[in-house]
Amino acid sequence: MRTTNRPERACAKPAAFILCATALALSACGGLRAPAGTDAAASPAARTLATPLADGRTAEGGVVDGFMFAEKPGDVAIDPVSFSSGVARATGVIEPRHGSTWGGIALSTALQRGGRALDAGSARTLAISLASAGSGVLRVRLVGPNTALRDSGCYPVAMVRVDPELKEYAVPIASFTPESYCGANAPAGAAAAAALTAVEVADAAVTPGRRRQVDFKVGVIRALP
C-alpha cells in the first residue's frame, strides 16, 4: 500500500548494502549554480539541485512531496510534512501489526517544474543534507522519467548512515545501484543521474512486532563534479 498526493506507484524493499557516506562541511561552493539554460554536463562547478522552501516548493522550481508505503494496509502512518527554509521534515509511525515485511515513509524532491528531467550525468557525487532521529540509515534513490522503472522501484538506491543532526553527506554516484530484484535493464547511478527528475529519501526499516517513530529531515541537494 502507498499513500501520496501523486499517482500511485510500487515501492521497493530496502537494499542490503549500506554506504558510509562522507559528511561534508558546508563550503562556499554550496551557493554556486549552473548558469540559466545550461545543465550539469556543461558545467564543471558544483550545482545546487534543490533548496527546500517554507511552502513545500524548492528555490529551483521543484516541489517536495511526502508519502508512505507498506506491504499491508495500516502498518505505516505519515504525518503532514513540515517545512522550514532549507529543510523538509517527515514524521510518522511504522508498526507492522498486519504483517508487513517492508514499508516506510519517504520524501521525494522533484528537481524542476513539471517533473522535467535534468542532466547531472557529469557529477561524481550527490551531496545531500540529511538527519534522522528515528533510524540511523536512510535510503536515497535517484529517480528518472521512466514510468515502468519508477513504478517497479528499479531506479538505483544507496543506503546512507546518518546522524540525528543535519549534515551534508557526500554519496558517490557510482554507489547507487538497482535493488537486487530488478532486471538487467535497470539503470545504475550514472545513467540515472543523466536524466534525473527527483531525489527520494526514505526511512524504510521495518522490524516485525516493533512500533517505531519515524523522524527525518532532508535539506539542500547538490551535484558535485
Write out the residue ranges for each language-model feature.
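Residue-level signal for mature regions of secreted extracellular proteins and peptides
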Residues: 22-23, 147
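C-terminal motif of bacterial Sec signal peptides marking the signal peptidase cleavage site
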Residues: 26-28
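Beta-rich carbohydrate-recognition modules and glycan-binding surfaces
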Residues: 30-225
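Bacterial N-terminal signal peptides that target proteins for export
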Residues: 3-18
